[in-house]
A protein has these predicted regions:
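Positively charged, solvent-exposed patches that mediate nucleic-acid binding
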Residues: 1-98
Length: 98
C-alpha cells in the first residue's frame, strides 16, 4: 500500500493541510492551487488572509517553516472562521510537541 512521505508534524482538515518543518529562520509558505481558485485575485486574497492571521495571532513564534496547502472549501469561509481554523491547526501542532 502507498504511504505518502509526509513530514512528522502536520495537521489536516477539509480546508487546509499545515506542515511544520524545523528550519532557520522562521518562515511561512502558502500554496493555493490554480486548479481550485481560477482567478489570481482570489488566490492572492487567500494568501493575504492567511499571512494576516499568522501575524495577528503571533503563530510563528519559534524556529521553523510552516507550509500551508489550501483546499477549495477554504475560499468559502468567512475571515473569522478561517482564523479559527488556522489557529486550531497550529495549536494542534504545538500540542504534538514541535
Amino acid at each position: 500500500m502507498f504511504q505518502p512521505n509526509l513530514p512528522k508534524h502536520f495537521h489536516t482538515s477539509k480546508n487546509i493541510r499545515l506542515f511544520y518543518l524545523p528550519s532557520e529562520p522562521p518562515a511561512l509558505r502558502i500554496s493555493v492551487a490554480k486548479k481550485n481558485f481560477k482567478l489570481a485575485v482570489d488566490r492572492n486574497k487567500i494568501k493575504r488572509q492567511i499571512k494576516e492571521i499568522f501575524k495577528i495571532n503571533n503563530l510563528i513564534a519559534g524556529k521553523g517553516l510552516f507550509v500551508v496547502l489550501v483546499y477549495k472549501p477554504f475560499g468559502e469561509l468567512k475571515y473569522h472562521e478561517a482564523s479559527v481554523e488556522i489557529v486550531k491547526a497550529v495549536e494542534s501542532l504545538y500540542q504534538k510537541g514541535i
